[in-house]
């Protein structure tokens, strides 16, 4: 059995630590941290750390940010098989500004993903699926993505005899539910 983790809209998570955020002033950053992010990547890292089954990741990465993302994930979890689909657009970033009292998040929305790249992702995924495998699809969709793409992915997974867990919200969650996803974990994000 292999655990396949799809992150539709991955991001490099950047955390800036400051003493105190003062609006409309220069804030000196004490510490900067970069890590590969996205709900599906977090699932993959946890599954890899558990060590009970091989883990593979899928999604869309592009540009120099995509290269950095792969390097960061390799450093944190070298056992994960990275099977990303290459996109033209830069991989997005999320920014967290942390001080002693609060955290402020700035999340880029990411770039639209053409249908042809979704088809590549599905072909890449199904080429690696076996009947006892599990697939997780976790997180938000890139902008302008038809939420019924999750129904297409669920159907392809079931056609291969594998099972699927969906962790998302809104119309994408409903599309996956109507397509017969095996497990749904609705969320508000």
Residue positions per predicted region:
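Positively charged, low-complexity intrinsically disordered leader regions
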Residues: 1-24
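Conserved phosphate-binding/catalytic loop of the ribokinase/pfkB sugar-kinase fold
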Residues: 86, 96-131
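Glycine/charged-rich beta-loop-alpha catalytic/anionic-binding loops adjacent to active sites
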Residues: 22-31, 105
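Conserved beta-alpha-beta core of the PfkB/ribokinase-like small-molecule kinase fold
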Residues: 134-189
């Amino acid at each position: 059995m292999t655990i396949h983790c799809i992150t539709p809209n991955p991001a490099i998570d950047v955390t800036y630590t400051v003493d105190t955020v003062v609006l409309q002033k220069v804030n000196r950053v004490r510490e900067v941290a970069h890590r590969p992010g996205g709900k599906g990547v977090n699932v993959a890292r946890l599954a890899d750390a558990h060590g009970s089954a091989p883990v593979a990741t899928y999604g869309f990465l592009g540009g120099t940010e995509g290269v950095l993302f792969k390097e960061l994930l390799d450093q944190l979890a070298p056992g994960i098989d990275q099977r990303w689909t290459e996109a033209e657009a830069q991989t997005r970033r999320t920014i967290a500004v942390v001080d002693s009292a609060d955290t402020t998040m700035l999340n880029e929305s990411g770039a639209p993903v053409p249908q042809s790249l979704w088809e590549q992702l599905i072909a890449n995924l199904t080429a690696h699926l076996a009947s006892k495998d599990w697939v997780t699809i976790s997180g938000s969709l890139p902008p302008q993505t038809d939420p019924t793409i999750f129904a297409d992915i669920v159907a392809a997974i079931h056609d291969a005899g594998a099972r699927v867990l969906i962790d998302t919200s809104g119309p994408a969650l409903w599309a996956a539910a109507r397509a017969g996803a095996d497990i749904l974990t609705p969320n508000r994000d």
